[in-house]
């Protein structure tokens, strides 16, 4: 094991077909997930040694978990540790495979006769399967999972927990689907697992997401598939066939790092009419940072220095970086409308209204001449979010943070409702 000389590794906690899990004696609540150079299909009815697969799988999982973690998805991932292992929070695994897909293919067609391959699901289709090798992982309903009354790390898996995993599965699929699109790859479907963190008692995405976990079709073309299906489809396993499978896996591993970047640049420029509005603008900048969007603050008055306002506008128009302008001006807001009337870039007015004159001042942002499409958002955080939604159309990293934020808000409401109901009992 590559990491044995640097980590104080304890007993083996679990061994599966393609990985082993070890306790870390110096890091309570953490484990080491060690991948194997083994590939399997059909619940290990077919299995082969594939040199280098452990490193490939570990790289893919580490990149995908990093992508999801940075977006805001709770994952059982701490850091990559060597070429073939990573460190993660220890979890008690929930024995369910959650499958989510956009395109009908594979076993779905067998289970749903009459549905043609290529049928698309809107929203993505979520299914669950009980992990039971002896019975070929039978499909379960949500009701069966609830009725099982599983308890992991002290958390009983009830309706709330099932709903959380179902919604998280869809969000995770959509984030990965969106992330693969810039690479001209279609994420057809995927399977994931959740666990309960033994320390926080939270449900988190766990196990691995590697090239065994999904169907990935370059250019949306099944004949170009780069996932484990290419191994399943081998009529006979030969050295040449395994080499072809390995090349497919290497192809994915080379590109997965690109998912952590975006070629689409973005920027928010906040124009304030006075430094007295700095506190309001700092809130916008902080919120932009949460979405990974660079934000610059400038001071200019469209009333007192319109020439300088337009010069600043031209400065940002000239460097080719996609930009959203946010105008922050109290009292009579000339800044937003003047900017909007002189640029093709999006402009958001975010006036810092005061209790005394706010009801009157806001009309200078709302009632505008024809030909102006300047939006008005009163919340500093809301204006940053709207800018993020604009950039998210072409930037998968920004979009992923938005999607994860929607999921996390939904989960917090679901958990709050559960807590209130328990208090009423």
UniProtKB/Swiss-Prot annotation:
What is the role of this chain? Bifunctional phosphoribosylaminoimidazole carboxylase and phosphoribosylaminoimidazole succinocarboxamide synthetase catalyzing two reactions of the de novo purine biosynthetic pathway.
Reactions this protein catalyses: 5-amino-1-(5-phospho-D-ribosyl)imidazole-4-carboxylate + L-aspartate + ATP = (2S)-2-[5-amino-1-(5-phospho-beta-D-ribosyl)imidazole-4-carboxamido]succinate + ADP + phosphate + 2 H(+); 5-amino-1-(5-phospho-D-ribosyl)imidazole-4-carboxylate + H(+) = 5-amino-1-(5-phospho-beta-D-ribosyl)imidazole + CO2
The UniProt record gives the binding positions of CO2 as 332
Check the record and name the Gene3D superfamilies matching this protein: 3.40.50.1970, ATP-grasp fold, B domain (3.30.470.20), Phosphorylase Kinase, domain 1 (3.30.200.20)
**Alphabetical UniProt keywords:** Acetylation, ATP-binding, Decarboxylase, Ligase, Lyase, Multifunctional enzyme, Nucleotide-binding, Phosphoprotein, Purine biosynthesis
| This enzyme's EC code(s) | 4.1.1.21, 6.3.2.6
Residues modified as N6-acetyllysine are: 36, 247
Q: Would you identify the family this protein belongs to, as annotated?
A: In the N-terminal section; belongs to the SAICAR synthetase family. In the C-terminal section; belongs to the AIR carboxylase family. Class II subfamily.
The GO cellular component terms are: cytosol
Protein name, as recorded: Bifunctional phosphoribosylaminoimidazole carboxylase/phosphoribosylaminoimidazole succinocarboxamide synthetase
Name its pathway. Purine metabolism; IMP biosynthesis via de novo pathway; 5-amino-1-(5-phospho-D-ribosyl)imidazole-4-carboxamide from 5-amino-1-(5-phospho-D-ribosyl)imidazole-4-carboxylate: step 1/2; Purine metabolism; IMP biosynthesis via de novo pathway; 5-amino-1-(5-phospho-D-ribosyl)imidazole-4-carboxylate from 5-amino-1-(5-phospho-D-ribosyl)imidazole (carboxylase route): step 1/1
Name the gene for this chain: PAICS
Subunit and interaction comment: Homooctamer.
A Pfam family: SAICAR_synt
Where on the tree of life does the source sit, at the highest rank? Eukaryota
Which intervals of the chain are annotated as region Linker? Answer: 261-266
């Amino acid at each position: 094991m590559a990491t044995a000389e640097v980590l104080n590794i304890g007993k083996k906690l679990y061994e599966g077909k393609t990985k082993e899990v070890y306790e870390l004696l110096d890091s309570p609540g953490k484990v080491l997930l060690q991948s194997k150079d083994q590939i399997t299909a059909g619940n290990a009815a077919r299995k082969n040694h594939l040199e280098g697969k452990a490193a490939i799988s570990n790289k893919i999982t580490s990149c995908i978990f990093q992508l999801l973690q940075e977006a805001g998805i709770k994952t059982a991932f701490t850091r990559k540790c060597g070429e073939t292992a990573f460190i993660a929070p220890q979890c008690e695994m929930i024995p369910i495979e959650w499958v989510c897909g956009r395109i009908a293919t594979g076993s779905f067609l067998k289970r749903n006769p009459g549905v043609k391959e290529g049928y698309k699901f809107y929203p993505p289709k979520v299914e669950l399967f009980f992990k039971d090798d002896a019975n070929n992982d039978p499909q379960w309903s949500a009701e069966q999972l609830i009725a099982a009354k599983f308890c992991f790390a002290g958390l009983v898996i009830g309706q709330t927990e099932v709903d959380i995993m179902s919604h998280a599965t869809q969000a995770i699929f959509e984030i990965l689907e969106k992330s693969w699109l810039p690479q001209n790859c279609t994420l057809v479907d995927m399977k994931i697992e959740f666990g309960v963190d033994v320390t926080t008692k939270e449900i988190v995405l766990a196990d691995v997401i590697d090239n065994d976990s999904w169907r990935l079709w370059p250019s949306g073309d099944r004949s170009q598939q780069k996932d484990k299906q290419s191994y399943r489809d081998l009529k006979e396993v030969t050295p040449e066939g395994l080499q072809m499978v390995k090349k497919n896996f290497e192809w994915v591993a080379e590109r997965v790092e690109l998912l952590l970047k975006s070629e689409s640049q973005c920027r928010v420029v906040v124009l304030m009419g006075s430094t007295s509005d700095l506190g309001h603008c700092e809130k916008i900048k902080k919120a932009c940072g949460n979405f990974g969007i660079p934000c610059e603050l400038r001071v200019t008055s469209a009333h007192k220095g319109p020439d300088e306002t337009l010069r600043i506008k031209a400065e940002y128009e000239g460097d080719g970086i996609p930009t959203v302008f946010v105008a922050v001006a109290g009292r009579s807001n000339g800044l937003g409308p003047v900017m909007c009337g002189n640029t093709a870039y999006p402009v958001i007015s975010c006036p810092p209204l005061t209790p005394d004159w706010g009801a009157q001042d806001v009309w200078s942002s709302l009632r505008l001449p024809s030909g102006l499409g300047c939006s008005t958002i009163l919340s500093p955080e809301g204006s940053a979010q709207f800018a993020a939604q604009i950039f998210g159309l072409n930037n998968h990293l920004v979009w992923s943070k938005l999607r994860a934020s929607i999921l996390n808000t939904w989960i917090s409401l679901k958990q709050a409702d559960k807590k209130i109901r328990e208090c009423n009992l």
